Amino acid sequence: MTTLLPAEAGAGAVAPPAPVRPQRRRAGAWRFAVLGVLGLYFLVPIGASVWFTVRDRGQGGLTAEHYTGIPTAEGFAEAFTRSLALAVLTVLIALLLMVPTVVLVNLRLPRLRTTVELLTLMPLVLPPIALVVGVRSVLAWAPDYFLNTPLAEAFFALQKPSLPWILVLVYVVLALPFVYRALDAGVRGADLPTLTEAARNLGASWPRTLVSVVLPALRTSVLNASFLTVALVMGEYTIAVILGFETFPTWIVRISGSQPQLSVAVSVLSLLITWVLLLLISALDRRRGTKETS
C-alpha cells in the first residue's frame, strides 16, 4: 500500500486565508483618526462661518440675504474688479517673464539653474513688510527729488487708485517663487529638448516654437502657476493697505466693522471659488494624463 507524502496530500487543498495582522488594523485606525481630526479642524470653522452668515439675528431663522446682497454691496464691484484686473496683469507679466526664462535655462543655460532658483526664492526670504517699506520709500522720491520731471510723472502714474500698477510690479516679484517652481516642474516632466529640436528642424522660429510647442506641453504647469498667482493677488492685504489702495481683501476688512455677516459671507464665497478652481485644474490634469496614456 502506497502512502502519500505530506506535500502530495495537501496539493489539492485550499490554503486558509492569512489572518489580518493587528498592526495593520491599528495603522488603518490611526489613519482614519488623523484624517478625521484634520477634517474637523478645517470643516468646523467653515461650518461656523456659514452658520454665522445664514442666521437671522432679528427673527432667529435662516436667511440668504447676506449672499444675495454681495453684488450690490457698496464698494464690492470696484474692489473686486480692481483686484481681478491686478491678478490678470500679474499673471500675464509673470508668465511672459518666467516661461522664456525657464525654457532657456533648461535648454541652453543649465549652469544658471542654481542662480535663477536663488533669485526666485528671494521674495520668500524677504518679509513683505520690509518689501513694502522699501517700495514706499522709493515712491517718496518723486515729490522730494524729482518733482516736475518725467520720472516723477511716471511714479505718479504707477500710483493711480483706479489701477495701481505699483501693486502689479510688487505682486510679480512676490509670485516669482510659485511661478518658477510650477513651470520648472512641468519642464522637467516634459521632453522639451526633443520637442523643440523637432520644431526647429521643421522650420519653426523660436517664438513659434514657444507658442505652438512649449506652451501646450506646459499647459498644466501654466494653469497651476496662474492659479497660485491669482490666489496670491486676491488674498494679499499687507502691501495694499500700507500703500493706501483699496483691493478686495482691504474692502472685506473695511466692511467687517459695520457689516460683519456680509464680510464673512464674501470670505466663504471666495473660499468656495478657490476650491472650484482647484478641482477644475485637477480635472484638467487628470484628463490630460488619460489622453497621454491612451
Annotate each language-model stretch with its function.
Residues 29, 37-74, 294:
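Short membrane-interfacial helix/loop motifs at transmembrane-helix boundaries
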Residues 1-35, 109-113, 281-294:
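Transmembrane alpha-helical segments of polytopic membrane transport and secretion proteins
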Residues 156-200:
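Membrane-cytosol interface at the C-terminal ends of specific transmembrane alpha-helices
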